[in-house]
Structure formats: C-alpha cells, structure tokens
C-alpha cells in the first residue's frame, strides 16, 4: 500500500520541489498534531489565517449548525439567506460608514480580481498602479500587479497598463494621474518581510488618488481582523479606502474573502452589463457562518486590542535568543538574517524542534513569525525554548 507521502507527491499538484511534508492529523488552538504523536506550534497561523486559532469551539459550532441546514443554494447574489446578511451586518459595525457594500468571495486573489474590475468599470480607465514587493494573489489580474518579476516572467504577457511604484517613496505618488483607475496598496507589505507604510506616504497617496479621481484599494488580506493591533491596519493611518480587500483571517479557517466598497460604487457591477462579476460559490453560507463566529470571538476576547501588547511581548522574548534585527507590526514579526542560507537553516531548525516558522515570498533572508492572536505567554515560552539554539 502506498504511503500518504508517496500519494501526496505523485497525485497532488505541487507548488515547489520541496514541500514541508508535515503529516498533520489534527489541530487545536495554537498546536498541530502529527500522525505519530508529533506536536507543533503554529507560529505562522497557516500564513495569517488562524487568528482565533485552529478549530475554535465557537467557529466549529457555527459550521456544524449551518451545515445541518444547507450548504449551497444558488450562485452568488440571487437568494437571501441569514448567514450572509448577519455577516454583512457585523462588518458594518466595525467599518467606516462609506464601506457598506460587501461582495464575498472564496479567496483573497478573487477579491483582488473583483476590485480591479470594479475600479475599471467605475472609472472608465485602464491603468492600475501597485508597488514593488507587493503581493495581492496569483490569478491573472492579481499576478499582473504583483511586485516581483521573478514570479511573473513565466506567465507573460499579462494584463497591460500596469504601473509599478516604489513603496514609501513620496516622489512616486505624482505618477498616479487622471489615467489611473486605481492604486492597490498594502498597509504592511507582509511578503517583503513586514514593511510598514510611512504615515505621511499613505496619507499623501490617499490625497493624490482623491485629487485625480483614482480609486484607492487597500489590501488587508493579511493584516485584517486584529493582526496589527486594531481591527484593520488602515485605522492606524486615519484614511478610508475606496475599496477594501479582506481574507485569510476573516473566516476562522474557512475559505472566505471579500472586496468592500460604497453601495453606489458597487452597483456598477450590476448593470451594463448585468452580471458584471459573478461566482458560483461566493458567500458560501457555511463559510459566512464561520466568519461571523470568528469575528464575534475577536470582539468578545478583544484579540485585536491585545495584539500589540502580545506582539511586543513576543518580540522581547525573541530578542533574548536571536542577535538579529526584528521587524514588527502588531503580531506580525520577521527576523532579519544576513543570508538566505541562514534563514532557511533557522526555519528548518524551528520545524525540527516543533515550531513552524517560514520565509517570505519576496524576502528569503527573513523568518516569518505570526502566531494566532489567542496565544498565551506560556505558549510563547514553549516556542521560545525550542527556538533557542
């Protein structure tokens, strides 16, 4: 009989020649458990997904309750059902008044695609600006605005009229003109190794977009739902995006994302032509129920307000065991190594000792650290002890 590893390598499409190959049987809270009794602490939250931890009882209960009623009824946007409406109502309570219309999707990259279409449709323009070392997804439109030629080159030609700007460079802002449909920006460039936007830069960018009539699309797929110390990272900067992208930590572990805009703007996708953006599984009722439960957990346990304090505590503990620079935005951290080899060695050491850490897509010299927001100090110490060399 073929092993699970053999089957995985030969029949499950691979994204890299060297997958991690951890065989996980179950997960609870901040821990993953292997088939042979191995115990790992998830120090990356499944890449910014498990903000409330794995299999949170409230999320599991919501999934079980909704799945006993119905799991799919019709393609997106046709039927009225409670999980979708309740989730939208809850989001209204934590967002600025202008962001009041929600298009739920299955993944972050789908949210990006929808936002790009909406921007082009609403402005009648074609140019999309984004930033070097930015990541917004891997489908064709999102790939076109990705901030790395390394990952784009093999798939050219991509969507035309893309303007690549340098992040945190105020002189670049003037390149956003009345030809620009939208500027897509991360408040924290996660895949660059945790690079925070400068306050003045982001505020000036928002002003320029308003001045020339370009839409400001803020990507909070990794930073949203408490990861940076507020519910959304843009709140630190006193700006309001025209379109907001959310995903990853949104669903409590289930696949759901969204692009969010003002109702008047979002209506542009409903006519000329009708069905301007459609999806079969978007706003899946089970995923909506999970997302609502996850949001309720974050609010009830004040996880978003505790993330800064916990992140600072974790940073102080890491500083005692690594003599390297550490970057941090709330509970998003990176350890800066001198070489890629040093970083990969550290990541492998962590996994071998039960601590799952990883590298970044556009910064192979940095170690990614971002545990679930529910992590306790005792659990931090469990990881720190095992990361000590």
For the regions a language model picked out, list residue spans one by one.
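Conserved N-terminal phosphate-binding loop of PLP-dependent enzymes in the Aspartate aminotransferase
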Residues: 1-389
């Amino acid at each position: 009989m073929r092993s699970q590893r053999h089957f995985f390598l030969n029949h499950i499409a691979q994204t890299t020649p060297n997958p991690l190959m951890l065989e996980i049987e179950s997960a609870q809270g901040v821990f993953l458990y292997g088939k042979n009794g191995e115990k790992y602490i998830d120090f990356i939250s499944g890449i910014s997904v498990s903000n409330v931890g794995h299999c949170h009882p409230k999320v599991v209960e919501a999934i079980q309750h909704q799945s006993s009623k119905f799991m799919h009824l019709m393609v997106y946007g046709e039927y009225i059902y409670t999980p979708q409406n309740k989730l939208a109502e809850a989001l209204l309570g934590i967002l600025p008044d202008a962001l009041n219309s929600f298009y739920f999707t299955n993944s972050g990259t789908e949210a990006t695609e929808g936002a790009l279409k909406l921007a082009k449709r609403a402005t009648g323009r074609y140019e999309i600006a984004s930033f070097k070392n930015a990541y917004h997804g891997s489908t064709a439109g999102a790939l076109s605005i990705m901030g790395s030629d390394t990952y784009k080159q093999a798939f050219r030609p991509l969507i035309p009229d893309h303007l690549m700007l340098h992040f945190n460079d105020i002189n670049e802002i003037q390149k956003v003109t009345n030809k620009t449909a939208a500027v897509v920006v991360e408040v924290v460039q996660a895949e660059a190794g945790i690079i925070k936007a400068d306050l003045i830069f982001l505020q000036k960018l928002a002003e320029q977009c308003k001045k020339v009539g370009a839409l400001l699309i803020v990507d909070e797929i990794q930073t949203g739902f408490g990861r940076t110390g507020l519910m959304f990272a843009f709140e630190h900067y006193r700006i309001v995006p025209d379109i907001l992208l959310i995903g990853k930590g949104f669903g409590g572990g289930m696949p759901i994302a969204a692009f969010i805009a003002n109702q008047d703007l979002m209506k542009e996708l409903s006519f000329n032509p009708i069905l301007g953006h459609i999806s079969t599984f978007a706003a899946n009722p089970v995923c909506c129920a999970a997302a609502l439960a996850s949001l309720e957990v974050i609010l009830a346990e004040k996880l978003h307000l505790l993330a800064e304090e916990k992140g600072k505590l974790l940073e102080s503990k890491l500083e005692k065991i690594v003599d390297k620079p550490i970057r941090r935005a709330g509970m998003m951290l990176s350890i800066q190594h001198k070489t890629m080899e040093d970083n990969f060695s550290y990541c492998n050491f962590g996994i071998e000792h039960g601590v799952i850490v990883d590298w970044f897509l556009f910064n192979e010299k940095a170690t990614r650290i971002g545990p679930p927001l529910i992590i306790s100090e005792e659990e931090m110490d469990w990881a720190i002890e095992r990361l000590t060399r």
